[in-house]
Amino acid sequence: GRYCREAGIPFAIDASQSAGKIPVDMEKQFVDVVAFTGHKSLLGPTGIGGLYVREGIEIRHTRAGGTGVRSAIRTHLGEYPFRLEYGTHNTVGIAGLHAGVRWILGRGLDSIHEYEMNLVRTLRDGLASIPGVVLYCQDDLADHIAVLAFNVEGMDAADVGTMLDVDHDIACRTGLHCAPLVHEQLGTIKIRGSVRFGIGPFNTEEHIAKAIDAVAEIASLRRH
């Protein structure tokens, strides 16, 4: 961010995965634009997100339409936030996002992070003890959030995810996780990516124990 600021280049970050997990200080990190979605760690519903734009940054709108503000004007409004907004707002989504953010602020980001990381450490240790399970994480989980990716040797990631869902009623995410270049480096393209567990503030130790047992059962079926 600092290098971009010194070179006069706007610096934008995609906080879709990190908003609600990691605090963003736009001044200290020299951030000009932050894009985020509401339905992940901000605990809002789907269909809602936002764009935070630092004062002085000009973004050209790509769509135009009514805003309900100064409707007699025949051109799209040029000032923020109307420049980037048009049509009827998703008021239900906004209310849901507000409720999620309010809950997070009440609980505290640090408190949530500590709780989730304690769970993911237990999950990591449990999965690491299972023969045939390959983990994609640092040993000490430094600079980590409560997301853990893994594979079972000899098994397709999608098949593992299906068994977790159908046989164990456990939700997970399988695939390339919008990061195909990472999976090219990991060599996991042919097995369709990896299996990913995302731990949230409403997960419990019982959930973690169930997930470990389920993966152990699935791994026992692997091809040798």
Language-model segments: which ranges?
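A short glycine-threonine-serine/GTX helix/turn-capping micro-motif
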Residues: L77-T91
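Conserved PLP-binding catalytic core of the aspartate aminotransferase-like
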Residues: M117, R121, G132-P180, Q185-L186
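Conserved PLP-dependent catalytic core of the aminotransferase class-I/II
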Residues: V92-G93, L97-H144
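Active-site PLP attachment segment
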Residues: Q29-I73
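Structural detector of well-ordered beta-strand residues that form the stable sheet scaffold
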Residues: A12-D14, A35, R60, Y136, ...
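PLP-dependent enzyme catalytic core of the Aspartate aminotransferase-like
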Residues: V166-D167, H183-H224
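Catalytic PLP-binding core of fold-type I/II PLP enzymes
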Residues: G1-D32
